[in-house]
């Protein structure tokens, strides 16, 4: 048992911890590809313990139904909470999150999550933990009033920035590179003595892009990208002021399936 798990036993009952371990054992035995993220991966990389009410398992959308069957056989009640990004497996009052995308539909779990994952042990079960690059990609878009994951991003960079593939992280953020830049500026503020954890070329490249947007000026299109990072804090701009909603335009495989189903005639005829 890791130091973090030892601390967890002080605040969580045995039944809850057993449920998490049983879920990991069942999924591991099934051969379904998955990685552990959330508080366990965060502790693995940073050494920072955070008491957690659940276990976050990340997997591809196409494997969720199979995971539901496996966990159902292990005594869990499974349901899809949101077709865009998350399912849940319950055992009594305890649950496991099965996550296949970020809530905004951008950080979709793909093969790279497993290819670059790291070996670890969680609840006595050998597992893979999500790569820090993909964790930062997913967490970077969580900037709600009641939950802001930017501090997690900073602590991850401080801990493992020198080990990360910054080329892949830049590629992950793609057209949303300004979100990454905002977190890197905050990181530099938080840890001025460890700025070198972020390669100089990364900052130079992002600041170059930023300078280009200053010269570019305003977009002609009246769009709000704020709901990509906060679902609620920009509702006024979209619903009252009439801005186009960038969140609604994200291409996500799960969202496309939902849209196709919605177009079917009554009775499900094609």
Predicted regions and their residues:
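Catalytic metal-binding acidic patch
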Residues: 38, 43-71, 153
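Short, hinge-like loop/turn segments at secondary-structure boundaries
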Residues: 52-54, 76, 97-98, 115, ...
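Conserved catalytic core of two-metal-ion nucleotidyltransferases
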Residues: 72-112
